[in-house]
């Protein structure tokens, strides 16, 4: 039996594994090899690694974790999890299973894009979701935002405030906001095209947005804030409480509502903030926190002294 199983081999999972390895815990990291930021060539806001390739960060992270003899990394797909604290069973797609005393869920989320021809192909390479991650590189160029709801309209206002004065909101079938937000868009000189978007083609720096009617729109980059869903249903199957946006609810120690189950990265968040902060560097921090408090959990169980304020 492993002391800890970390499900997910991205920044959060590897960070948790690194911390556990340094405490000489017998841990298994299970990596499906499907990171959310796979389309991205660069990551940002990571001190000393600004502009670094995410895939290279994962490669180096795996090498560091592999340097600790008590930690094993396994490329596999988890299909089911069951059990309770001190005796969880994790099943794999190849028919094997392993047991662990504690779990860290770092399985991440999946972006859900509108079904528009060319959008998925260009996502991360001309079509971007985050102004913090990609706004600087797109500054002072003709930009567009895709979508007509509150979130996309606020994204358009933010980009116009921080990065460009040449921005078009492509509402993709209709602007679904109230008069105050419509007035804000007008006041900030953001034109709105409400025709449905049918196709996007080109490359980063030279996109063409085609509509169901009217002239195509030439832009340097397109921003869109997609919906998300959990990459797996493992947390739900264990009974972990989920927040309205689908994130796994955790406390300040990255504990879920199920004893012995921790969660880290963009799969989880505190209930109090209005939304997640799904950045690589915050995922690393979450993974470290989860491992530190999980370590304390195992230690206190060993010496039979509970952590104050925990179940």
Where are these regions (language model features)?
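Active-site glycine-rich loop that binds ribose-phosphate moieties when present
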Residues: 125-132, 145-157
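FAD-binding core/adjacent interface of flavoenzyme oxidoreductases
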Residues: 1-4, 72-141, 248-257
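A conserved FAD-binding loop/helix module that cradles the flavin
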Residues: 17-18, 155, 264-311
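A Rossmann-like FAD-binding core segment of flavoenzymes
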Residues: 59-92, 97-100, 163-249, 299-310
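Short, hinge-like loop/turn segments at secondary-structure boundaries
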Residues: 45-48, 144-146, 185-188
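Short, well-ordered coil/turn residues at beta-beta hairpins
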Residues: 8, 106-108, 113-115, 146, ...
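Beta1-alpha1 glycine-rich phosphate/pyrophosphate-binding loop at the start
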Residues: 2-59, 142, 151-175
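FAD-site-proximal beta/loop scaffold in flavoenzymes
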Residues: 121-137, 227-281, 293-296
């Amino acid at each position: 039996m492993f002391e800890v199983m970390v499900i997910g081999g991205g920044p959060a999972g590897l960070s948790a594994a690194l911390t556990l390895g340094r405490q000489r815990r017998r841990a298994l990291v299970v990596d499906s090899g499907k990171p959310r930021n796979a389309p991205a060539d660069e990551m940002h806001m990571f001190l000393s690694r600004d502009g670094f390739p995410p895939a290279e960060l994962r490669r180096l992270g795996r090498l560091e974790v592999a340097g600790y003899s008590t930690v094993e990394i396994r490329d596999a797909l988890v299909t089911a999890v069951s059990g309770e604290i001190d005796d969880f069973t994790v099943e794999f797609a190849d028919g094997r299973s392993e047991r662990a005393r504690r779990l860290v869920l770092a399985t991440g989320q999946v972006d859900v894009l509108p079904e528009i021809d060319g959008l998925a192909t260009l996502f991360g390479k001309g079509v971007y979701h985050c102004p913090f991650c990609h706004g600087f590189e797109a500054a002072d160029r003709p930009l567009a935002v895709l979508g007509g709801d509150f979130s996309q309209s606020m994204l358009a206002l933010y980009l116009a405030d921080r990065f460009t004065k040449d921005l078009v909101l492509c509402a993709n079938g209709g602007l679904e906001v109230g008069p105050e937000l419509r007035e804000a868009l007008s006041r900030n000189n953001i034109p709105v095209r409400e025709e449905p978007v049918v196709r996007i083609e080109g490359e980063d720096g030279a996109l063409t947005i085609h509509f169901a009617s009217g002239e195509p729109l030439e832009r340097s980059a397109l921003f869109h804030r997609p919906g998300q869903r959990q990459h797996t249903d493992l947390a739900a199957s264990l009974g972990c409480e989920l927040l309205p946006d689908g994130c796994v609810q955790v406390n300040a120690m990255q504990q879920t509502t199920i004893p012995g189950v921790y969660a880290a990265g963009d799969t989880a968040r505190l209930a109090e903030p209005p939304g997640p902060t799904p950045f690589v560097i915050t995922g690393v921090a979450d993974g470290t926190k989860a491992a530190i408090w999980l370590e304390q959990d195992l230690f206190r169980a060993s010496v039979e002294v509970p952590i104050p304020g925990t179940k």
